[in-house]
Amino acid sequence: MTTPYEPNYFDPLSTDRLTNIICEVFEHQPLVPMTLEMEKFGGSGLYAIYYRGASIELYAPLKNYEMPVYVGQAVSNNSTTGKGVKSRTPLHGRMSQHRRSVSDAGLPLSEFFFRALRMPDVHANLGEKGLIRGYRPAWNAILSGFGSNEQGSATRASAKSKWDTIHDGRKRTYGSEPHDRAKLVTEVEQHILERIAAYDDLPWRRAGTNV
């Protein structure tokens, strides 16, 4: 008589395993104040923006958590054509662009922080998707438009983004303003509380990161 038996399956290079490793290593990188004037550095990679202050009531619940408000990547190759990007400093450039956006919107730079990690595009893509899926950062999930670029008349004719509706001030022009600011504020408030409740559920979370 045979005994039912099936060995466990293990794939050390599975997408989920690689994603968790990338996210864990990323979260061991230091938080860098957005006020820091960074010298240019080369390379592409993964980055996130964190709020650790108290003056913006909307984001104040995040101050004791290393929970990003925005996650993105800066690539070395165009995903459509496969050609290399013109800049040799795409990660630095993207972080500098976001710093200007935060400043132009009148938000306190001293209360925002960067975290970044240089890596190949394929791994940055995995990390970006993993962090966004896990944390659902407010500027990715609710207040879309933060990372967009203004590009000529087509963009100027488009609707004002949700992010710019809440954080007005960037030197851009828009064709319409369709979003209700009060409704967006309520959505963000509820969303942040929900994400804080799930803060320790992520597979790569390390103990003791909330300070």
Name each region found by the language model.
Residues 1-69, 73-211:
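Boundary/linker segments flanking structured domains
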